[in-house]
UniProtKB/Swiss-Prot annotation:
UniProt remark on domains: The cysteine framework is XIV (C-C-C-C).
GO CC annotation: extracellular region
Protein name: Conotoxin Cal14.13c
Tissue expression profile of the protein: Expressed by the venom duct.
Organism whose genome encodes this protein: Californiconus californicus (California cone)
PTM statement from Swiss-Prot or TrEMBL: Contains 2 disulfide bonds.
Main location: secreted
Sorted UniProt keywords: Amidation, Disulfide bond, Ion channel impairing toxin, Neurotoxin, Secreted, Signal, Toxin
Length: 68
């Protein structure tokens, strides 16, 4: 019984770890490569309000694009 539960948990976890996570990180890598502006969540520490993360650094040069 216990073995069966473990197998089911593994089967549930595998698609997420393999698919979702890799897609998430591939998306990030693609946006960094192409130079698209990315949100501050990629910067550490996060950018201040109104600044944009670009290549891991904060920049306010995109303020005009944000409609404010």
């Amino acid at each position: 019984m216990k073995l069966c539960v473990v197998x089911v948990l593994l089967m549930l976890a595998m698609p997420f770890n393999g698919g979702e996570a890799s897609r998430f990180f591939n998306q990030h890598a693609r946006s960094q490569r192409s130079g698209m502006k990315t949100r501050g969540i990629w910067c550490d520490p996060p950018c201040p309000e109104g600044e944009t993360c670009r290549g891991g650094e904060c920049s306010d040069e995109f303020n005009g694009d944000l409609g404010g």
